[in-house]
């Protein structure tokens, strides 16, 4: 679904373990890594889309995870001009995303799989919470930063989480 401003409605998933690490996945056929994400279908709520994408991209059911939080508002990013398909109608100039923070208990890591009908990822690893900011493609960095900062307070941690840019303590648990 593309809105009147040209932004495609989408969900992003930050899947965290109990150590505060997040699932970081490599796209099939590319040397690029990202969080699971995907479009919202017609008539679907962002929450429904998130659970569908969780299954389609990572092989997890709602029973495998605990929903901790979601961003309050849509977070937007514009696509670089070279990625805009000018012959497409309606024209998509970027994405607007609702982000969800989920907790995966360690016993459920065995359920993570990519052998789905249309695999989008072929490898995954647990990385530190802020690691994706320096690794994701440049045009998504602002959205990743806003989503990670907004959702960080909901992480169930046994240690401090420090903002990468400032070295300030974000929270102490």
Swiss-Prot record:
CDD domains: NUDIX_Ap4A_hydrolase_plant_like. Pfam families: NUDIX (PF00293). Residues 6-149 form the Nudix hydrolase domain. One of its GO terms (molecular function) is pyrophosphatase activity. A motif (Nudix box) lies at residues 38-59. The keyword Transferase does not apply. The keyword Cell membrane does not apply. Keywords: Hydrolase. Its cofactor is a divalent metal cation. Its EC number is 3.6.1.-. Belongs to the Nudix hydrolase family. RppH subfamily. Accelerates the degradation of transcripts by removing pyrophosphate from the 5'-end of triphosphorylated RNA, leading to a more labile monophosphorylated state that can stimulate subsequent ribonuclease cleavage. HAMAP family: Nudix_RppH. PANTHER family: ADP-RIBOSE PYROPHOSPHATASE, DIHYDRONEOPTERIN TRIPHOSPHATE DIPHOSPHATASE. This is RNA pyrophosphohydrolase.
